[in-house]
């Protein structure tokens, strides 16, 4: 039984879990936040040392009604070091939670801001 326990322990060490990246995430819409059109969001991400994340970092923007699971998620594409653009489309008006998730290797950080979406 001990060899099995040792193997399971080693396997657990090999499977890397995500850890907090402590990234600084700033984002804002660059157009009117409204329904049925793609709304561009500028996203800026720096690591804990203040260095911009590379353009190939995995940055996602998700939209959800507050307290609910995301309705849609879009990939933000890199336009420069630490600079990304995402264009979600809001299906209805009202208050929406916009969450940006930035990932680099096994580091991940999320930030959520609520926006009022016009019709």
Residue ranges and their predicted role:
Residues 1-5:
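Positively charged n-region of N-terminal signal peptides that target proteins for export
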Residues 7-17:
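Hydrophobic h-region of N-terminal signal peptides that target proteins for export
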Residues 17-119:
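Contiguous segments within soluble domain cores/interaction surfaces
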């Amino acid at each position: 039984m001990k060899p099995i326990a040792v193997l399971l322990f080693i396997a657990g060490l090999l499977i890397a879990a995500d850890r907090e990246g402590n990234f600084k995430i700033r984002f804002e819409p660059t157009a009117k936040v409204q329904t049925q059109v793609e709304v561009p969001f500028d996203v800026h991400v720096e690591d804990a040392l203040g260095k911009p994340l590379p353009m190939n970092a995995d940055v996602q923007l998700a939209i959800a009604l507050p307290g609910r699971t995301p309705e849609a998620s879009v990939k933000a594409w890199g336009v420069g070091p630490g600079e990304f653009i995402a264009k979600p489309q809001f299906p209805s008006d009202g208050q929406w939670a916009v969450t940006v998730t930035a990932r680099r290797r096994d580091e991940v950080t999320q930030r959520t801001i609520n926006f009022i979406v016009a019709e």
